[in-house]
Amino acid sequence: MPCTTILVGKNASYDGSTLVARNEDSSNGVFEPKRMRVVHPDEQPRVYTSVLSHLTVELPDNPMRYTSVPDVVPGHGIWAEAGFNELNVGMSATETLTTNERVRGADPLVDYVPAKGKEGEDGYVPAQPGGLGEEDMVTLVLPYAKSARDGVRILGDLLERYGTYENNGIAFSDVDEIWWLETIGGHHWIAKRVPDDAYVTMPNQLGIDSFDLDDAEGAQADHMCSADLRAWMAEWHLDLTPGVEGDGPATVFNPREAFGSHSDSDHVYNTPRAWYMQRCLNPSDVWDGPDADFTPESDDIPWSRVPERKVTIEDIKYVLSSHYQGTEYDCYGSKGTPATRGAYRPIGINRNSQLAVLQLRPYAQPAYRAVQWMAFGSNSFNALVPLYANVETMPEYYADTQARVTSENFYWANRLIGALADVRFHECGRAVEDYQEKVGGMGHKQIHDVDAAVAALPEAEVPAELARANEAFAERVRVETDALLGKVLYTTSCAMKNSFAMNDNVR
């Protein structure tokens, strides 16, 4: 999916948490309804078949409970996207990536090939299943991962065995580490540990810009990869490091150069998003003018950086909601020209489906350590709400999304707010910001209060209390969301083209 990701190491976050956040965006012209769900071990398949690629995978018989954010409309798979399992391991999948022709030739993607002819007749060729995709990955990995590294290992094994039909980036987290895995061609992959003191920005483009093969093949302190990566790169002359003798590759090389893309479309769709996110978190750099360190179309924007100050939940929400505020590229702004204001793809876009921020707090007990912050609809107009992940059920307000449009659940209420507020952006802006700040403040207080309330409880009683707290908070969010919907509906209604000032029925 055309998503945007930010990862924050524990020493770069405001409270020592590991933070994994990703927008799930639908394709252009598609708006995919989403909902929250808790998947129990008896609901997890033991034999899984992908809808899109027709791949069948046998799964272990010991899955853990996990949270997910699946699609509502059936017919094209689960698309579980993001969640935590019982061991407080988080996974977010996937960020669709780009690659280049050399990689496509060296290790072709594993596409589904339909059957030809009729079975039993001459010339019949049976269908060939494709590999793994975004549809499948959380379902196949998260219920079994015992740590972030273990998640990398499980997915890596699956990729080497079954392959993939698309290029993807996947994040894994636990309370100590975040790992980022990028698929390379059909069967190869690399993974890198996010530095504890840094953040990572990821648009839809292969991102890792430095990789240590010796570490990946040895201690794996910060790097992991598919078993034959070095030999495969040498055979296909994929390393572009200057000065490397023979077939290479160099011990330390740049995967973005070797495996990635630098296309014209990247410069309007991908690099501007990384540029703006890093502009927000490292504002002292020069971002504008002829002496800029990086421009919106730079190909060398770093994969990871140390922020100028610690990164908060609100910082993450802001950058993942952004439309280039304060620049000539803001689609709602007055700077620049009509051409510049539509030049680059916003991060907060009309087709944001959901935003999941996975927070693992080292100071909280394991029974209530994991908090999954959620928002639905276009991020420029929605608010993040926290949910404790160690629960058996999710509140109906977040879980009962249907294909039918209604204001009775969080997904559709936010979709309606976004569509109404967009057309009167400046008139609705104050009400939207007030809502975002109020709900955000309510969320932080909710976590503080519930932490204190469950701290002395026996561990077995904690999940039920967390579920009650999630439900009570959802009802408060419903009240605030309904109020905002009423405000933006009123504002937009007053500005309708067919309005007329004269009336004859004054109450």
Pin down the residues of each PLM region.
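Soluble extracytoplasmic regions of secretory-pathway and membrane proteins
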Residues: 21-35, 96, 181-183, 319-330, ...
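Short Pro/Gly-enriched beta-strand edge/turn motifs at strand-loop
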Residues: 60-66, 152, 334-342
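A contiguous strand-loop segment
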Residues: 2-134, 154-289, 293
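Glycine-rich, aromatic-lined ligand/substrate-binding cores of catalytic
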Residues: 231-368
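Histidine-centered catalytic/metal-binding microenvironments
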Residues: 436-507
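Substrate-recognition/cap regions that form aromatic- and gly/pro-loop-enriched pockets
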Residues: 324-325, 329-456
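Short, well-ordered beta-strand elements within core beta-sheets of diverse protein domains
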Residues: 138-144
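Short, charged, surface-exposed loops that flank catalytic or proteolytic processing sites
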Residues: 144-150
